[in-house]
A protein has these predicted regions:
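Anionic-ligand binding region
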Residues: 157-204
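N-terminal basic/disordered segments at the start of proteins
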Residues: 4-8, 13-51
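C-terminal functional extensions of proteins
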Residues: 222-225, 229, 233-240, 246, ...
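Short, polar loop motifs at secondary-structure junctions
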Residues: 47-53, 128-132, 162-165, 182-188
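Glycine/small-residue-rich loop that forms an oxyanion/phosphate-binding "nest" at active or ligand-binding sites
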Residues: 78-89, 96-146
């Protein structure tokens, strides 16, 4: 990982408590981490940025690792990062009893790397299944190549799909007047500029938890730019619900980019079922780490 930063929370140690590796963001991650800590687990939580790390309150048994998985060295890959993390846990004599993938549904490279790496190491892997949200006037797109013909000439669009695919979205909708909401990172800004977006139509916003404050900021952005159509990702969970609410309140058209298919061998469970599957840490103390059947990796 790049520029790793470790934050071990203050509080009594749990020398006998088993370890679990959680890969998450700011949506369901903090809630899931708290529930697992309350169940007695020690957690090593991987987040992409320091801003994401601030969503996790310091708690006994919680260790945060900041940085994209597999970005510590030039040419490194997510799979190399997963292998390194799993090997490191054994070296520290803190082997993971479970790995939980609560990463963004569109972080498909991370999920694929976790499936392969955990399969090789025989460490049980679970995927947090985000809900399928319904309701409201939305249009689903299987991929960005379905954007052709969706935009009227001069129609004001807000692209909230992350920076990596901005150029593709702009190319598919040349008739639209594009605006973008991106994370405040140099690479994201470079990608927005490379897509041909002028600086005055790019907003670099720090991620905020879904709620009233975030809604006010992005509603104000839509009003200022006179947005007519929003393109975002069908990620499930707080992020998608947030954009659904904004578009409903402001009367905007909402286009949702369908999430990529996940590996068929990966066991995905809703939050409560996932917690039940992992169980209490006290039930795992003294037991060997159990590999899952091959179809669950």
């Amino acid at each position: 990982m790049h520029a790793l930063s470790f934050h071990q929370s203050a509080g009594p140690a749990r020398p006998q408590a088993p370890w679990l590796w959680l890969i998450a963001g700011t949506g369901e991650g903090p809630q899931l981490a708290t529930a697992l800590l309350q169940a007695g687990w020690q957690l090593r939580v991987s987040v992409v940025s320091r801003a994401a790390a601030r969503a996790y309150a310091p708690q006994p048994g919680l260790q945060l690792v900041v940085g994209a998985i597999g970005s510590s060295d030039a040419g490194a890959t997510p799979l190399a990062g997963v292998r390194q993390e799993l090997a490191g846990s054994r070296t520290r004599q803190q082997p993971f009893r479970w790995v939980i993938d609560a990463s963004h549904p569109f972080a498909s490279r991370i999920t694929a790397a976790l499936v392969q790496g955990c399969g090789e190491a025989r460490v049980p892997l679970l995927r947090l299944q985000r809900p399928e949200l319904a309701g409201g006037a939305v249009e689903l797109l299987a991929d960005l190549n379905e954007l052709g013909g969706q935009a009227r000439r001069g129609e004001r669009w807000l692209l909230a799909i992350g920076a990596r695919r901005l150029a593709e979205a702009v190319h598919q909708t040349p008739e639209a007047l594009h605006h973008a909401r991106i994370l405040p990172r140099p690479q994201a800004l470079q990608q927005a500029m490379a897509a041909g977006l002028p600086a005055e139509r790019v907003a670099c916003l720090q991620p905020l938890p879904a709620g009233a404050q975030r809604a006010r900021v992005e509603q104000a952005l839509c009003r200022r730019w006179k947005i007519e159509t929003v393109l975002c990702r069908r990620s499930g969970g707080p992020g998608e619900a947030h954009w659904r609410a904004i578009c409903r309140e402001l009367g905007l058209r909402l286009l949702l980019l369908e999430r990529p298919a996940e590996p068929g061998a990966l066991l995905s469970l809703p939050l409560q079922q996932l917690l039940e599957r992992v169980g209490l840490a006290t039930q795992a103390v003294g037991e060997p780490s159990k590999g899952q059947p091959s179809q669950e990796f």
